[in-house]
Amino acid sequence: MTARYERSAALYERAVARIVGGVNSPARSFKSVGGGAPVFMARGQGPYLYDVDGNRYIDYIGAFGAGMFGHGHPELVAAVARAAEGGTIYGTPNPWEVELAERIHQALPSMERIRFVTTGTEAVMSAVRVARAFTGRPKIIKMEGCYHGHSDFALIAAGSGPSQLGTPDSAGVTEGVAQDVITVPYNDLDSLGEALDVWGPQVAAVLVEPIVGNFGVAMPKPGYLEGVKRLAHAHGALLIFDEVITGFRVAYGGAQTLLGIEPDLTTLGKIIGGGLPLAAYGGRAEIMDWVAPLGPAYQAGTLAGNPLCMQVALTGLEILSRPGVYERLDADAAYLADGLVRSARSHGHTVQLGRAGSMFTLFFCDEPVVDYRTAQRSDPAKFAAMFRGLLDRGIALAPSRFEAWMLTVQHTRADLEETLQIADEVFAQMAGQ
């Protein structure tokens, strides 16, 4: 590692001695972009990150989708200070959780009843549990390559075909768990129908990202989500939308509002916390009323609904509800993404674009990405070269070809212009290698 990252390298040496792999989430590791020490950030301001060596970066990591507001947003900073003065955790109900639940229901009417949790993993795990309780069925169908957190059932890879049960995709996940998970390709109604024809009477729910953000950004084909809902309901299964990434990202009311399709249950996370750890799950009242204390599906959390997160979340949603916010984000993302595509292609690189609102992915492959298998064709070496070239010039991306570029409410057109100029230099350098 060069002198530019000298302090990051020193911190990484210390980190690997006490923190597993030197990082607190594998997504932060540089393993897939050539290895070595990741960059350690010391502070953020607006759309910028500053590392421990004093280097400035235009931030498109966006905290993997959670950082919709940029860094140090003055209204959120004030909300944190104001809330903290009144105490950060009570262990009792509080008025702000009621107000936040009402605000979320206004944005996503399908969420008639809501329960707050701390992480997206908890939200999905809890939604699946109540779906199983409500239907009395054990199995879940999910889509290949879609990440739903790190609970055991979510870490099941596809079997040899849509009628086959999955296999564990992580050490420590048992074959017993895998027996209750079927994985089929995204955007493939035939495979979903085949799986339901075989396992339908045992399937509690079909779990899907309505717009994929976890193998890069991929949109549903026309009619796909309508077909998923129709097939699920025809077999007595529920439809769960995992909107941990897309909720309040692609539209104020998430993908379900943007696309006009309501699920039975929804999970939210990332953005709703305003930068603090907060997630939620909810849906039709008749289903959610199976959750304790009303029903037999148990779920609880010491930090759930704490007053600090509730008040900051309310401030965040107030910011996002203002006129023109999403229109500007969409226009800025289109400007940047389209400019990157033109630049890359002008230097001879074959790229495909997946974009939904203010998140997008550049895939280094020769055909549009519609599912995980086409996403895997994106050239890892080319992504790594782009990632490193941008990083060395002050542009920060998530270190994976399957992650999205994330815009914030604090990026300006000047930031986008600077990014395009730097990216053009990088694409030119890559073409000459």
Swiss-Prot record:
CDD domains tied to this protein: OAT_like
Cofactor(s) essential for the protein: pyridoxal 5'-phosphate
Reactions accelerated catalytically: (S)-4-amino-5-oxopentanoate = 5-aminolevulinate
Residues annotated with N6-(pyridoxal phosphate)lysine modification: K270
Primary enzyme class: isomerase
Location in the cell: Cytoplasm
UniProt keywords, alphabetically: Cytoplasm, Isomerase, Porphyrin biosynthesis, Pyridoxal phosphate
Major subcellular location class: cytoplasm
UniProt-recorded Gene Ontology molecular function terms: glutamate-1-semialdehyde 2,1-aminomutase activity; pyridoxal phosphate binding; transaminase activity
EC number(s) stated in the UniProt entry for this protein: 5.4.3.8
Keyword Cytoplasm: yes
Lineage top rank: taxon: Bacteria
Residue pairs linked by disulfide bridges in the UniProt entry: none
Pathway as given in its UniProt record: Porphyrin-containing compound metabolism; protoporphyrin-IX biosynthesis; 5-aminolevulinate from L-glutamyl-tRNA(Glu): step 2/2
Gene Ontology cellular component terms for the protein in this record: cytoplasm
One Gene Ontology biological process: protoporphyrinogen IX biosynthetic process
Gene3D superfamilies in alphabetical order: Aspartate Aminotransferase, domain 1, Type I PLP-dependent aspartate aminotransferase-like (Major domain)
Classification via NCBIfam families: hemL (TIGR00713), PRK00062.1 (NF000818), PRK12389.1 (NF009055)
Subunit structure: Homodimer.
Homology family: Belongs to the class-III pyridoxal-phosphate-dependent aminotransferase family. HemL subfamily.
The name this protein goes by in its record: Glutamate-1-semialdehyde 2,1-aminomutase
Organism: Symbiobacterium thermophilum (strain DSM 24528 / JCM 14929 / IAM 14863 / T)
Lineage, top ranks: Bacteria, Bacillati, Bacillota, Clostridia, Eubacteriales
Gene name of the encoded protein: hemL
